């Protein structure tokens, strides 16, 4: 109730004051705004709108409020925060900041912040507290803690060192502040640690292991080394690879190097590197600058070792022997260094040194090499004479003949090849195998290949067929053979040296062998030329005989079926036709001194080699003749033979009836004489069948053994039944004997087949006995009929 009366009395008093108050004039808010804007536009009033537009504030008031806010915030305030507090546009704040900085020297602008000296003093006090606590502080850590730039902070702290901050700045690294106690403590640790080191130690490893400040460590270490407190050197400067080398280690190191060099006469760069010497070459040059040394790739050699090698080389050259310098050198020297050393030793000899280096370390005198070639002299003559007899076609090539002085007169006259060949043929040509060729044999020459054969020693005959130039196909010995011979005469020689020496000797030995072959060939040619050569008349007679034989053999083949004719044709081409071809090739080979004693020894490869030396006109005809031997037609062969004889100026006498009868008689006589003396059942059957064929058909037949059954089958209607039955029975026994022999060969020495062997033996004996009983009867089929028959001549 009392409160209500109190409120009534207060309202009555306010009413009374209002009755007695004087009335005044008031401007509206709009009029006030217009008046202020007019004053601002006339520059009679300088005020700034607040951001909400409700107040005006003067620049002086802005500056005052900024100073107040800076003081309130401890001397550091961001201008963005000032703009929010004062509530004016940021441009007005920035314009007043520049005025404050100009008027007040203790205030500065850093990264959009106002900072005064009071704040920096306070910051320095905090830094000093941290410094005294830890002994060191880094500017980088302070930058992160106080969000200030490093240069500004370094400058501010430097000004307060000794005044507020009790410490000093590292001169080498201005980003660290130390206390004297910290430096002294670390200096003592560094001094103690490095005093205990006795071998080269990387400084960087100590920094990480013991937690040293890197720049402080290098500064203290250099100071201790320069003052002599630490005995040693820092190699590598202030880098990650810096190494502290104590003097005691350097002295021990130098003592070891001197001792090793004095005892061994050389130094290994790797060994010095393992001792902790990074640049071994420069170390050696500095330490032994007055000593004569030879620097190799991985070692350094003293003059004593060089003189020892030089003396051994000189002795080997003067005595005509060889020397391997490897045993004279330390085992640790590489082959490359040994080769470089030997090269330096050989240099003073210059062109006067008649020696060759093998395997990088073996010095061989020219006299020793000459002696080695002399080891093969006798073998050269033996091989040349042997090869000369066997196959001279492989020994002398066309290029070799150009170098033989005795043939120069022949090479100068090349006007007419046919005339020249005819002239030589009248003097004589190579002898050939005589006879009618009825049972000519086949010859095969097997080629062997040596494992040590070199490319330059091989003769690819395909090159000659393509007309390409090639090296002489003359090889004395292959490398492995030469090595075997050298091992017998050179004792205790390294295998590599033997191999290289053999390879080196191949060419000179082949060259010497070529000269020996020429000498043997020419002497053999001159000594036996008269006996070896045959006249053109003898050749024409022999070619004519073989030609007529082929014609008669072809006539006899026509009695058989086509498949049998094919087999007979192949056999005839392989034997008699090949013989007549070889006769002609051997005759042409005499132009090149390539004729052989026995034309039957000429193979297809030798014919190709002879073809490569013929003139184009002769070569075409002889090539067709050579190729026709691989065909299946006797007519084609005879056609090619006619062309070949015409190209070679060989006249062939074609046979007439009388001549054919003579050939038939002579052929039968030769077969009968062979039948009389032979005891081989298979050959008896073969000869009897061929003779019965000739007696019944009056035609010659040249047949292989596999065609005998067909001949016997043909004779079934040509001879009496009893004779044919006897012939068939004898054929069965021959086949049985051959089968038995093949079984015995295939079984070998199998113990489980003893019983079978016994039975087989009994059967074989019975067969052989029966064949012996019938052989005479089989021979009589021909020999008795020959006595009773009419003479064919």
Curated annotation (Swiss-Prot):
Region Mediates interaction with CDK5RAP3, annotated ranges: 490-683
Residues annotated with Phosphothreonine modification: 535
PANTHER family: E3 UFM1-PROTEIN LIGASE 1 (PTHR31057:SF0)
Organism: Mus musculus (Mouse)
Tissue: Ubiquitously expressed with higher expression in pancreatic islets and other secretory tissues. In the embryonic brain at 17 dpc, detected in Sox2-positive neural stem cells and in Slc1a3/GLAST-positive radial glia. In perinatal brain, highly expressed in Slc1a3-positive Bergmann glia of the cerebellum. Continues to be expressed in Bergmann glia of adult brain at 16 weeks. Expressed in adult heart. Highly expressed in the intestinal exocrine cells.
Main location class: endoplasmic reticulum
Ranges where the record places region Involved in CDK5RAP3-binding: 121-250
Function: E3 protein ligase that mediates ufmylation, the covalent attachment of the ubiquitin-like modifier UFM1 to lysine residues on target proteins, and which plays a key role in various processes, such as ribosome recycling, response to DNA damage, interferon response or reticulophagy (also called ER-phagy). Catalyzes ufmylation of many protein, such as CD274/PD-L1, CDK5RAP3, CYB5R3, DDRGK1, EIF6, histone H4, MRE11, P4HB, PDCD1/PD-1, TRIP4, RPN1, RPS20/uS10, RPL10/uL16, RPL26/uL24, SYVN1/HRD1 and TP53/p53.
UniProt protein name: E3 UFM1-protein ligase 1
């Amino acid at each position: 109730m009392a409160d209500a009366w109190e409120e009534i009395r207060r309202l009555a008093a306010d009413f009374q004051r209002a009755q007695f108050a004087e009335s005044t004039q008031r401007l509206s808010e709009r009029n006030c705004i217009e008046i202020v804007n007019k004053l601002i536009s006339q520059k009679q009033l300088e005020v700034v709108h607040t951001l909400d537009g409700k107040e005006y504030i003067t620049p002086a008031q802005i500056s005052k409020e900024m100073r107040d806010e800076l003081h309130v915030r401890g001397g550091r305030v961001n201008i963005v925060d000032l703009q929010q507090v004062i509530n004016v546009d940021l441009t007005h704040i920035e314009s007043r900041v520049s005025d404050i900085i100009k008027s007040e020297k203790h205030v500065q602008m850093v990264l959009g912040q106002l900072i005064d000296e009071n704040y920096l003093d306070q910051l320095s006090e905090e830094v000093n507290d941290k410094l005294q606590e830890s002994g060191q502080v880094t500017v980088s850590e302070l930058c992160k803690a106080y969000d200030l730039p490093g240069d500004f902070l370094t400058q501010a702290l430097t000004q307060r060192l000794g005044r507020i901050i009790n410490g000093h700045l590292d001169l080498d690294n201005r980003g660290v502040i130390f206390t004297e106690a910290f430096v002294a403590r670390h200096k003592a640790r560094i001094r103690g640690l490095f005093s205990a080191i006795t071998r080269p130690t990387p400084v960087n490893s100590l920094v990480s292991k013991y937690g040293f400040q890197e720049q402080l460590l290098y500064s203290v270490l250099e100071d201790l080394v320069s003052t002599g407190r630490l005995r040693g050197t820092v190699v590598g400067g202030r880098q990650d690879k810096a190494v502290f080398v104590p003097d005691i280690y350097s002295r021990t190191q130098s003592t070891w190097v001197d001792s090793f060099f004095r005892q061994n006469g050389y130094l290994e760069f790797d060994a010095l590197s393992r001792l902790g010497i990074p640049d071994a070459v420069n170390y050696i040059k500095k330490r032994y600058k007055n000593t004569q040394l030879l620097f190799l790739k991985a070692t350094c050699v003293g003059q004593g070792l060089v003189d020892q090698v030089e003396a051994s080389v000189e002795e080997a050259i003067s005595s005509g022997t060889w020397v391997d310098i490897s045993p004279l050198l330390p085992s640790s020297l590489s082959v490359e260094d040994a080769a470089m050393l030997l090269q330096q030793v050989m240099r003073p000899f210059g062109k006067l040194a008649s020696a060759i280096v093998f395997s990088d370390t073996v010095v061989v005198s020219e006299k020793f090499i000459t002696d080695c070639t002399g080891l093969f002299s006798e073998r050269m003559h033996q091989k040349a004479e042997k090869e000369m007899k066997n196959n001279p076609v492989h020994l002398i090539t066309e290029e070799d003949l150009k170098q033989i002085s005795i043939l120069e007169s022949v090479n100068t006259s090349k006007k007419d090849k046919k005339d020249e060949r005819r002239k030589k043929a009248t003097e004589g040509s190579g002898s050939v195998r005589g006879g009618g060729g009825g049972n000519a044999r086949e010859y095969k020459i097997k080629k062997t290949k040596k494992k040590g054969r070199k490319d330059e020693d091989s003769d690819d005959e395909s090159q000659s067929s393509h007309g390409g130039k090639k090296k002489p196909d003359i090889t004395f010995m292959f490398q492995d053979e030469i090595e075997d011979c050298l091992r017998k005469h050179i004792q205790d020689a390294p295998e590599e040296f033997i191999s290289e020496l053999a390879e080196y000797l191949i060419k000179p030995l082949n060259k010497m062998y070529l000269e020996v072959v020429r000498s043997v060939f020419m002497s053999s040619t001159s000594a036996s030329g008269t006996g070896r050569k045959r006249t053109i008349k003898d050749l024409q007679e022999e070619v004519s005989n073989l030609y007529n034989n082929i014609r008669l053999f072809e006539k006899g083949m026509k009695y058989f079926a086509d498949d049998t004719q094919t087999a007979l044709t192949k056999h005839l081409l392989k034997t008699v036709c090949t013989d007549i071809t070889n006769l002609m090739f051997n005759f042409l080979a005499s132009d090149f001194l390539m004729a052989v004693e026995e034309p039957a020894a000429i193979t297809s490869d030798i014919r190709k080699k002879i073809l490569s030396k013929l003139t184009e006109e002769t070569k075409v005809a002889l090539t067709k003749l050579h190729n026709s031997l691989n065909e299946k037609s006797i007519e084609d062969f005879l056609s090619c033979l006619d062309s070949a004889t015409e190209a070679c100026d060989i006249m062939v006498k074609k046979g007439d009836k009388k001549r054919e009868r003579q050939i038939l008689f002579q052929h039968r006589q030769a077969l009968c004489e062979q039948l009389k003396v032979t005891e081989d059942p298979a050959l008896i059957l073969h000869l009897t069948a061929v003779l019965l064929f000739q007696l019944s058909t009056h035609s010659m037949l040249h047949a292989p053994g596999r065609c005998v059954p067909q001949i016997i089958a043909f004779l079934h209607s040509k001879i009496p039944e009893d004779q044919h039955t006897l012939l068939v029975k004898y054929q069965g026994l021959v086949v049985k004997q051959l089968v038995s022999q093949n079984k015995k060969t295939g079984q070998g020495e199998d113990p489980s087949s003893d019983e079978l062997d016994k039975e087989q033996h009994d059967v074989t004996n019975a067969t052989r006995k029966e064949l012996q009983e019938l052989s005479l009867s089989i021979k009589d089929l021909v020999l008795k009929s020959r006595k009773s028959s009419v003479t064919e001549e």
